[in-house]
């Protein structure tokens, strides 16, 4: 499977059986810059704490960098 990986946001091969993920959360600059984003691959969908959103998928390049809605 191929997943986008941060910080370069490039598509890279991940080991067989892994899933791609997009993890987003707010930090101190969330109102100005939007949510922080972490893209990667893992053996299983990571468990996250409250306030962190995660989406996992299992097809090539299914985790593109999320677009931010403009006001």
Curated annotation (Swiss-Prot):
This protein's UniProt keywords? Acetylcholine receptor inhibiting toxin, Disulfide bond, Ion channel impairing toxin, Neurotoxin, Postsynaptic neurotoxin, Secreted, Toxin
User: Quick check: keyword Secreted in the entry?
Assistant: yes
Q: Name one Pfam family in it.
A: Toxin_cobra-type
Q: Which domain of life is it from?
A: Eukaryota
Q: Which GO terms describe its molecular function?
A: acetylcholine receptor inhibitor activity; ion channel regulator activity; toxin activity
Compartments where located? Secreted
Q: Which Gene Ontology CC terms are recorded?
A: extracellular region
Could you tell me in which tissues this protein is expressed?
Expressed by the venom gland.
Q: Does the keyword Secreted apply?
A: yes
Cystine residue pairs = 3-20, 14-41, 26-30, 45-56, 57-62
What is this protein's function?
Binds with high affinity to muscular (alpha-1/CHRNA1) and neuronal (alpha-7/CHRNA7) nicotinic acetylcholine receptor (nAChR) and inhibits acetylcholine from binding to the receptor, thereby impairing neuromuscular and neuronal transmission.
Give the family from UniProt: Belongs to the three-finger toxin family. Long-chain subfamily. Type II alpha-neurotoxin sub-subfamily.
Q: What is this protein called?
A: Long neurotoxin 1
Q: Which organism is it from?
A: Naja naja (Indian cobra)
């Amino acid at each position: 499977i191929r997943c986008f990986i941060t910080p370069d946001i490039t598509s890279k091969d991940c080991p067989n059986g892994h899933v791609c993920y997009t993890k987003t959360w707010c930090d101190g600059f969330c109102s100005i810059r939007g949510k922080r984003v972490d893209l990667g691959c893992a053996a299983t969908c990571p468990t996250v704490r409250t306030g962190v959103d995660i989406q996992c998928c299992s097809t090539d390049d299914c985790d593109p960098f999320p677009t931010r809605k403009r006001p």
